[in-house]
Amino acid sequence: MTDEQERVQPSGVWATAVGVARVRALETERENALFRDPLAQAFATAGGLWPSSPPLPDDEAARRRRLTVSFSIVIRTKFLDDLLQQASASGVRQVVLLGAGMDSRAFRMDWPEGTRLFEVDTAAPLDFKASVLRQERADARCERITVAVDLREDWPGALAAVGHDPAVPTVWIAEGLLIYLPEDAVELLLARISAQSAAGSRMGLTLGSRGVIERFGADAAPGSAASMWVSEMPDDPVGWLAGHGWEADSHTLRERAAAYGRPISTPPQREERPGGLISAVRR
């Protein structure tokens, strides 16, 4: 039986990772792409989202919201790519992707010799991903280690068991993850990250902006990403992270989009609050 025949199709929260892959595949096709993800189309195809996908809603407001989510995925991907490159340039050689989904950075980015990249996720998405990687004959550009564990369980122990060393700096990435976790789970996750982080560690987070659940969740289709969002960012994300021992900067989507040459033409609908694109350093 082939990988394609054995492959378990995406469902639940992790199915949203295939939708993210579709967005990255579309960006990759652009002449002025902010990044290139050669594996994204294969992930989207395997998940049934390429070349076709669910049509945009008829309602104009709902259509704009869908396009906004796709745009935010492109900008956050570029933001975290840059953060990872900066961390590598500073000498960090351990990378942990929490809720890794269909992330292909181990395959599409250039890594310094000695880099170890840990992908933490549950078994189902990791197995799905592995079957696509075999099909594509993909070779990682660094030492890639998968860690099949639920983030509600003892993932630090599972990470240590495969060689993560908390005594040396790590760069942690939680991309498109925290918005799916209740606030107490977010606090526990951050406490666990902090406990495994030596001085000089880096962290990149994406947080749901204040009010995003109300704006996007009201008419979200069952099973859609927005229908599963449960938490938003604190009013003061920089202060929140300082309380956990991190020196952080927050950036808005609008700010980063302009910096990347993709300015948002429409004026903000409300007063700009602290942004949900977070970079942080462990002191």
From Swiss-Prot:
GO terms for biological process: methylation. InterPro entries: Ppm1/Ppm2/Tcmp (IPR007213), SAM-dependent_MTases_sf (IPR029063), SAM_mthyl_Trfase_ML2640-like (IPR011610). S-adenosyl-L-methionine binds at D121, D150, L151. GO terms for molecular function: methyltransferase activity. Pfam families: LCM. Keywords: Methyltransferase, S-adenosyl-L-methionine, Transferase. It comes from the Bacteria. This is Putative S-adenosyl-L-methionine-dependent methyltransferase SAV_474/SAV474. It comes from Streptomyces avermitilis (strain ATCC 31267 / DSM 46492 / JCM 5070 / NBRC 14893 / NCIMB 12804 / NRRL 8165 / MA-4680). The lineage of its organism: Bacteria, Bacillati, Actinomycetota, Actinomycetes, Kitasatosporales.
